[in-house]
Amino acid sequence: MAVEFIFLFMNNLNKSTKTILLFILLFLGYKFIALSQPQLTKSKPDLTQSKFYSNSRPWTRWWWFASEIRKKDVADNLIWLRKNGFGGVEIAWVYPINRMIKDTIHYTPRQKWLSPEWSAMVTYAKSCADSLGMGCDFTFGSLWPFGDINVPFDEATMNMTDPTWRQEIAASWDYPKKGYVLDHLNKDAFYHYAFRTGNALKPALIGSLSGLFCDSWEVETKHLTTKGFNEKFRKRFHYDLVPYIDSLYSKRMPYAAVRYNYMKLLSEYVIENFYKSFTKKSHELGAYSRVQCSGAPCDIISAYASVDIPESEALLYEPSYSNIVASAAGLSGKRVVTSETFTCLYGWPRDHHSEEQTADLKLLADAIFANGVNQIIWHGKPLNPAGEDTVKFYASVHLGKSGTLAEELPAFNNYLEKVSENLKKGVSVSKVAVYLPTEDAWMEGELPTEKQFIWAWGAYEHRYSYFPKELKAWRPMWINSEFLEKAEFSNNRLKVGDFSFQACYVDVKYMDLTALRRLTELAQKGLPVCLKQIPAEPGFHPSDAEYKILLQKLNQLKNVKTSWQEMDQIGPLITGTESTDFWCRETADGLTLFFANPHSQGLIFPLEYGQSLNHTTDSIRIAIHNKGSTVPYTLVFRPYQSLLIQLGSDNKISIVDIYFKPKTPVYIKRPSVEREKWEVLSPKQQTN
């Protein structure tokens, strides 16, 4: 309340008096406000019960370019964010600005990385955020991925084709000095890195609960290895990996089968030694973990399920990808799904920078809400000198008073807050679990050239894993081998985490023996299974005998069908939704349903400038099937509007007011070019 009172008081002052008062407040460091805040200790944080966020206001990534960070700048930026409807920040430490022009001659003065002076400024930022009623998370390193100039050669990322190679990190806080990327498969190396990084952040973790953040993978993944990997591989699979290394990414046999075994072991290293270790260390420091597992060479559902807050990303990942993240959250009982949002909205690296249109942002936000996200993290806000807005980050929509978004920010953020708040209530609802084709992706290896980006080559990322269209009315969720194993079938429901499924849908070329074994067990207990095709066992030296027996047992069961049309005992959730994406949450009071405007369907990177332009009203007739009753309803989508409705336990529908009308966008068709900056040359193009 103190800060809100100060804002109201200052609004009635003239400019010069306001400036003097602000300077006094900044000089005092907000200590008189901070002292009034409860100083919580988190030596034993109860993260199992934590809501993590005190409200649903959107957050933003907050880039600190390597420089001499000043208290008055920190406070000024936070005040601006608070006034514009933001609920928190995620501090991300990056290179000095002169790195953008590849200047390696002129050194930018800055607090030394992880030094007491650096820690003091970070702690000040946290105390300012606390005083403003804002949250504050911290990236657990500088730039992406984890690594710095203190990582020794023998604890850096390794490649099995060249023992002298280590991945460098060249654009960190210490630029122009170069360091090494941490060996993410080496638990000891991680804890050495985490010890010094965590110690520097400890003072800032006093106060309100904070999160430690890990961005998307961005470790060189091809031929990734670590000490002892080959020996463990030989022990696990009873053959030597070395003879197959040179052709490990070939689609031919036996290399595809060997690659599956390699990916299976690599996945265990990534999840056990990195993601679980990161979450454990976060808890030791009294923080929660918030992680983008996207791009990691592992079982992606298990990875996302191993962290406290799984985070998606858009639009470098399509909105549909968020279903994987939200599925992992529901399977593991997590209630918050965040998203790094609006990244490279119109293209990479900086198309239409600072000219973004709110209507386009809303189009994307609605798409990810309908695919499971319930907390927005803007991408983002650079730390600027007090009173200025001259520093900008390239791969971002721009948050600042000089950007085109500034006028609409408070109202738009209020909209994002309302939707997020409602989509956090209760648990997500789905009628059918769909087996994610992880084995298929690992066997496939590289994506076709036309589907690759210069930063993404592998099918293992699941960028193009989509739900079957025939399942839309049942609001499917993904499941994997781990959660089939954890699930229990009782009272005609497959129960795991927050979900209570009525059936399992399997349409994969390959399925691991452990998954097939568990699927057969569940089907024998009565679980309805739609087995669209007969899978084969992946990997080199498979155990054919047991696999064939399990397939025979599975196919002989009456509750196992080969087409979804035969699964007529599984009633849908909502019919008539072919042209709108939706999300459903259930509370004791009934269902909360978010329906995205039909124009939000099928968004892909990049968005065209003004793609959201819309002058039409769309009406869609749906039927909600709930607890034995069918409730018909007509969805009326006015231009730029999505809908949030509540279906009470009495099956009566009420409308939640989330109306926000952005400025009418200007449409500019994207120029046609032979090849975009992010596209990969095909083999034919490379030879021309």
Regions found by a protein language model. Give the residues of each.
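Mature N-terminal segment immediately following signal peptide/propeptide cleavage
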Residues: 45-88
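Carbohydrate-binding surfaces of carbohydrate-active enzymes
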Residues: 59, 70, 75, 88-89, ...
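A short, compositionally biased domain-edge/stem linker segment
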Residues: 42-49, 416-419
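Short, intrinsically disordered, low-complexity segments enriched in Ser/Thr and Pro
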Residues: 83-100, 257
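Acidic/aromatic-lined carbohydrate-recognition and catalytic surfaces
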Residues: 94-187, 191
